[in-house]
Curated annotation (Swiss-Prot):
UniProt protein name: 3-isopropylmalate dehydrogenase
Alphabetized NCBIfam families for the sequence: leuB (TIGR00169)
Binding site for substrate: 97, 107, 135, 224
Cofactor note as given: Binds 1 Mg(2+) or Mn(2+) ion per subunit.
Enzymatic class: oxidoreductase
Pfam families, A to Z: Iso_dh
Amino acid sequence: MAQHRVVLLPGDGIGPEITAVARQLLEAVSQRHGFELCFDGQLIGGSAIDACGEPLPASTLDACKAADAVLLAAIGSPRFDNLPRDKRPETGLLGLRSGMALFANLRPVKIVPALIGASSLRPEVIEGVDLMVVRELTGGIYFGQPKGRIQADGEERGFNTMTYSSSEVDRIARVAFDLARERRGNLCSVDKANVLDVSQLWRDRVDAMAPAYSDVEVSHMYVDNAAMQLVRSPRQFDVLLTGNLFGDILSDEAAMLTGSIGMLPSASLGSDCPGLFEPVHGSAPDIAGQDKANPMAMVLSAAMMLRIGLKQTEAAADLEAAVDKVLAAGFRTGDLMAEGCTALGCRAMGDALLKAL
């Protein structure tokens, strides 16, 4: 029997509640498909600060690096807003990504038929949307040097540097090409090559890699047009490849096509390391401990972990099918509630998902 080591990071707010739901479903689906998941719970974020004074204990990072996959729930709490920036819960996530050498962020956006009315766009625009945003995580303007604020010519000036090396572009492009090959074979690379030298390099490197993926259709789109097309005609996209800044913006725009951030999973990947899988939503401290949380993004993140991180594709499909079945049956948590549907709390939704398996 195959064994997989999975680190669970419940984190803060609603994190422990949605982690409990995901764990029970993972245990059930692993038994059905004949593999074993060995779970290791670790601290991160505010819960780690409370326990040991640091948002990312060394023991947590060591455990994550030694695992086969990491499943994170949520990080953050306003209780820690008065701390120095480098001591806040969110720093734990940044340190985890850096320590695990994760450079590729994957954000799938897929319209669930039962929730098509939740989107602010017309059904005929978003019906059938199934796209993946692949965002580079460790380069670009967020990390480029030099950066800072200085006094110059009698006034204050702020500056940042947008920079990418050819190797940085190549490794994220390879992730996107591989995904496009597994999906529908269409890759759209997003840049601003008409005005930015760094984007011209980006486009050149993508074009240089394209011949090795002759089965993938490659196109390029300026970021401003991509932002417009995501709203105008999102079905045209399969895999979107972006740099750090553009991906940060476009992935959030794409997320809202679904109408609820409570349904969106994500993955962060490196070259030779475990993947980190987490919901897009935050820790929602205002509803923590009240059995109101929507666990579905966490469950779908667990499905991504099974498919991408552990190569258990049939088990992943079972989890995704359970989510579809429950929604089609009219069960909803409060954030998705609509007329004619049945309201469930977090634990009851977990039970419904378990039954749907």
